[in-house]
Amino acid sequence: MKEELLKRFTKYVKVDTQSNEESTVCPTTKGQMELANILVTELKEIGMQEVTVDEFGYVMATLPSNTTKEVPVIGFLAHLDTATDLTGKNVQPQVHENYDGKDIVLNKELNVVLSPKQFPELAQYKGKTLITTDGTTLLGADDKAGITEIMVAMNYLINHPEIKHGKIRIAFTPDEEIGRGPERFDVEAFGAKYAYTMDGGPLGELEYESFNAAAAKITFNGNSVHPGTAKNKMVNAVKMAMEFDARIPKEEAPEHTDGYEGFYHLISLNGDVEQAKSYYIIRDFDHLKFVERKTHIATVAKELEEKYGKGSVELKLNDQYYNMREKIEPVKEIVDIVSAAMRNLDIEPKISPIRGGTDGAQLSYKGLPTPNIFGGGENFHGKFEYVALESMVKATEVIIEVARLFEEKE
């Protein structure tokens, strides 16, 4: 299993599937469709049934039931795209066997070092096989670890018919990282009663609470005048954007929050004197606080427009997804089954809120309750991203055990 996981994973991460927020098509990048087609071929090769990919890049496939029992159809999902925070082009995965617990030099020329001093959690991976970046790209374990684990789990179940299970549906979705994953996902065609995303982090993570999420795009329209004659005429759009940001509570940012605390996050600020654009994401687990955060953004935008004149500040504020806890708690047994599966494999479940989003958040509101299971990765969305091969083995085993337990309980 280890060898298959390593082979598939290092193949998948080399396909550039970074999504593109600015694109209006689906999938937003050609690389996602390229990987989708690779997976379709491989799914057919291992013996999966009803293998399809649609024009939008959604891959679906079926592992038929091998039991006489009436077992609910369950699904497992992962996303094709990688994050936009750092390039996903020309990913060169580095394999470090029997990690010694010390610094890992990812890139000597650029002096990029993955160090336990900066990332103390590395200590728990001593003796494990770590897969890292070369210090110039992200790795893409989010979520190609999940894709790999689903592929290997399905292959294992096909080759071990003695493990009884009901019908299993799997799906690989595009554009999760920009919040569009479930937009064109056909829940009815997928046909599962419950599903799980393999999109979590370290070993044992199990999540069924997510943020309420919104995005704010703000355009500041200034007035560019020659600096020599600018008095009482120039309006600097960049300074307007800075003034806006000064009204956002500094302590309520990702770098100062954890647990159930929400935040405002300035993703980007670009512009010049004439025009500047800021992009924020807004996150909170509590719906009332979520609404308050959006109201604050809108209020600051309105007040700045009143100060600088009509049309000087343009705000586009839209909701992205909501806390899935409301939809999963009524069927909490689907979380309990995963907890039991983990314990059967000597994994201690670590149930915590997702400080992020998964396709499961939106799918749960579309009628498909979808908790999130660990994929094994750490430090997602950056050059220090890595995954332990042993954690991927455990995640694969959890998929298999969940399928077995659903059949056993009927």
From Swiss-Prot:
Question: What does the entry give for GO biological process?
Answer: peptide catabolic process; proteolysis
- Write out the catalysed reaction: Release of the N-terminal residue from a tripeptide
Q: What does the entry list as the binding residues for Zn(2+) 2? A: 142, 177, 381
Q: Which cofactor does it need?
A: Zn(2+)
By what name is this protein known? Peptidase T
Protein family: Belongs to the peptidase M20B family.
EC number annotated for this UniProt entry: 3.4.11.4
Q: Where is the active site?
A: 81, 176 (proton acceptor)
The compartments listed are: Cytoplasm
Q: Which UniProt keywords apply?
A: Aminopeptidase, Cytoplasm, Hydrolase, Metal-binding, Metalloprotease, Protease, Zinc
